[in-house]
């Protein structure tokens, strides 16, 4: 019953669903108090199989493996297993910017949130970064959602469709969960853009062969890439002569690297990704400079 589980319970209950929270461990007493106060049933130190007889869906917490008996039985009984971001995304029609990658997610999300806040776009920062998407939708909705998403959350999406997806990089960390199957891990990260259509945007690092080899020629969405060089038709941010350059349609935004809020080479890439997304959302150059 981590943060995403409690947030999902809250949101589901507020939308009129019958909800049970089930945890194989002991549930914290504060959480129990909250669940009782809003009339949500729970069970602890056990996942009872009888719930699978009536459940329409299971919202799975990121830490739970697909190989547990409970999950295997749910799959056998054809009960859909979804992640909390999949569930939450059904309850908003505001723009979602989802950010994933092996490294740099939190920095990029925080920077993007700061820019959008300065642009008065009323953003919310949520996901894998402290407050779950469901919790924010239930308690404090905004006008645009900056969402940090992990491969664990992407593994169980069905229709989750961000307006803007950002993929920062793909490297072989966190493979223990995937039996050291890096191809499966990389493919899971790519799911961030699988449901996008021609109105949506996919922003990615164009010097990462693990990403490039997975981008299909039939991609429907608008592609915007970033890297050191302006070397392809969809490059939207690059470095030239110690300047960060971001291209939006025909307009160029330039900023000297030493003037940037975040210093360090990896942060140049994080800033490029956040900058491209900001320009797509109509943020002015003056706000970007702040």
What is each of the regions a protein language model found here?
Residues 26, 30, 83, 197, ...:
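Short, solvent-exposed coil/turn linker segments
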Residues 5, 28, 105, 132, ...:
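Flexible, glycine-rich phosphate/dinucleotide-binding loops
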Residues 5, 92, 267:
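Short, conserved glycine- and acidic-residue-centered signature motifs
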Residues 11-14, 49-53, 62-222, 238, ...:
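Phosphate-binding loop of NTP-binding sites
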Residues 1-83, 87, 263, 283-286:
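N-terminal leader/targeting and accessory segments in enzymes
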Residues 1, 179-186, 220-290:
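Adenine nucleotide phosphate-binding catalytic loops in nucleotide-utilizing enzymes
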